[in-house]
């Protein structure tokens, strides 16, 4: 299953506390190792912002949850996604099924 993961940095305290949080984030991230069942397909940062997007393919939602729990200085949102052509195909199937229902 593919997941679109978005993140934003949580609000920090003073400028000094924020700088310390930035250092801690980088220290933790440097040590993180991507699990074998967690394939990163896209990993980008929003320009001029403290957040970004990751498209990951993973067969275990617990692994996705663990990733989101690794960096508590961020808020994460992980949403399962499907390719648009798959979505269009099943939507057309659903419409055809509904159109086949006879009204009374």
Positions of PLM-derived features:
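Conserved short beta-strand edge segments in small beta-sheet-based binding/regulatory domains
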Residues: 74-86
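Glycine-centered loop/turn motif at secondary-structure junctions
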Residues: 37, 72-75
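Conserved catalytic core of Hanks-type protein kinase domains
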Residues: 57-58, 70
